[in-house]
Amino acid sequence: VVLVAHSLGCILTAWWAAHTRHAAKVRGALLVAPGDVERPDLAAQIHGWAPIARQPLPFPALLVGSRNDPYCSLERAEALAQTWGARFVDYGERGHINAESGLGDWAEGHGWLQQLAAA
């Protein structure tokens, strides 16, 4: 199993990994543009997502962050990667790394996914 998570899915993945007994089935996780649910303006809009799980992930992970993501600063994304024991990629100015980012089929993301699957 290789997990792929975007935005709040990254937060959910960290929470799930901290509470499940099935993490050994996971080969890796590609975490893209996490949402900072502890940021006051976002926490007020999305109740019940904080606090963010702080345990290292029990499987290899790659976290991809953007310099101009409106939902998570690059510094915060890098700090989450460090907390979770994930490799961090500064993906430049790509917004929330979604369809609006103009990445199309996102060959680079597919390549990272293949690397995680092969690990």
Predicted regions and their residues:
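Conserved serine/cysteine hydrolase catalytic core
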Residues: H47-P60, A107, G111-A119
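Active-site nucleophile loop of the alpha/beta-hydrolase fold
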Residues: A29-R39
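Conserved alpha/beta-hydrolase "acid-adjacent" motif
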Residues: P70-R76
